[in-house]
């Protein structure tokens, strides 16, 4: 995944299954763990800010300062990375994959997928009739 992928401070994006290095900021670390565990659910920065008892603005700023990503950029990027993994298995249709990784709107999934990969999901892994 290359096109619009956020690349953090190091210039590289870690593999999803790698054990990430602990973040220095406890809020950023908590956000990263929460996203990795709950990416398929409806989650929002507001939910996290309430759980961590910090304002959305400060929480997002701390996350971006530590990771190079905004909350929404990382969440969408992580979801698309998971979608690509599921596509490679070839066991599900694209609309099913979209739902499994947390997108309730298939058209929005396509838009975000293209943003982060540079391609439509149908171009990379054609599956015939997807809907």
Tell me what each language-model feature is.
Residues 126-131:
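Generic C-terminal helix-cap and adjacent flexible tail
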